[in-house]
């Protein structure tokens, strides 16, 4: 059994069904790419895993989302869940404060006040997001002065600072230039040694480069999922082949 499982997961926005009987199993220490055309349910699905959809009043969910064998909607407080299942969004969203304070923000909320401990967490997290060498001499400067790619790696460091087990990434490179994108992709290969990574991407080449497993979403359903090399080179469903080869999407 994987670290995360979904069983017959359905999600509705009011009367509109956005996810239909999603059954997926995510193994620990892997990168899984969620692919599919715009509006197919990838990001909606990602947000069910750490209950971000709770913030939308019209959302109704049935079925199960299991994290380490427990139902995230019944057995977890959402604050604790989001600490253990972190999220990185499409656009970098640094807080308007120093680089140091951005990374220390989460640990402080969770009660860590000792400066030595915070220093250690900040350095470890920035090293974990491959940003430390670029910012170690300006930790007290505003995070808003960083480039877009640096800001996104800062957001990853901020997520790592609270020691999650799973990282959810919603198109984390779509707003970045090719060089910054490459740095994030290289980082993901490192991150999977410590974390389980689930990434939504529209970039087929990116999905092929970075992921161990891939799930193809279409119209709120999972058409096919499995090892990335099988999905890309030996798809079982013609719709998967048509999407990956660019015939639609």
Swiss-Prot record:
Record flagged with keyword ATP-binding: yes
Signal sequence interval, chain numbering: none
Protein keywords: ATP-binding, Cell membrane, Membrane, Nucleotide-binding, Phosphate transport, Translocase, Transport
The keyword Aminoacyl-tRNA synthetase appears for this protein: no
Residue stretches making up the ABC transporter domain: 4-244
Principal subcellular localization: membrane
Entry's EC annotation: 7.3.2.1
GO cellular component, one term: plasma membrane
Gene Ontology terms: biological process: phosphate ion transmembrane transport
GO function term, MF aspect, one: ATP binding
Highest taxon above the source species: Bacteria
Family classification: Belongs to the ABC transporter superfamily. Phosphate importer (TC 3.A.1.7) family.
Name of the protein described by the UniProt record: Phosphate import ATP-binding protein PstB
Organism: Clostridium acetobutylicum (strain ATCC 824 / DSM 792 / JCM 1419 / IAM 19013 / LMG 5710 / NBRC 13948 / NRRL B-527 / VKM B-1787 / 2291 / W)
Name of the coding gene: pstB
């Amino acid at each position: 059994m994987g670290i995360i499982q979904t069983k017959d997961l359905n999600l509705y926005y009011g009367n509109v069904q956005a996810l239909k009987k999603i059954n997926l199993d995510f193994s620990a220490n892997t990168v899984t790419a969620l692919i599919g055309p715009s509006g197919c349910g990838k990001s909606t699905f990602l947000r069910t895993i750490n209950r971000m959809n709770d913030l939308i009043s019209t959302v109704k969910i049935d079925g199960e989302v299991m994290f380490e064998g427990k139902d995230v909607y019944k057995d977890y407080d959402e604050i604790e869940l989001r600490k253990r299942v972190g999220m990185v969004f499409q656009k970098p969203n640094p807080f308007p404060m120093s680089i140091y304070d951005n990374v220390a923000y989460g640990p402080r909320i969770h009660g860590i006040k000792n400066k030595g401990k915070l220093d250690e967490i900040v350095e470890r997290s920035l090293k974990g997001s491959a940003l430390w060498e670029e910012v170690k001499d300006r930790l007290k400067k505003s995070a808003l002065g960083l480039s877009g790619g640096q800001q996104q790696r800062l957001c990853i460091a901020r997520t790592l600072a609270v020691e999650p087990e799973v990282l959810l990434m919603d198109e984390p490179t779509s707003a970045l230039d090719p060089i910054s994108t490459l740095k994030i992709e290289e980082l993901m290969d490192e991150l999977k040694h410590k974390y389980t990574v689930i990434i939504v991407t529209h970039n087929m080449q990116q999905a092929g480069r970075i992921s161990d497993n891939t799930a193809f979403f279409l119209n709120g359903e999972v058409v096919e999922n499995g090892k990335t090399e099988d999905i890309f080179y030996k798809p079982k469903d013609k719709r998967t082949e048509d999407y990956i080869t660019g015939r639609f999407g």
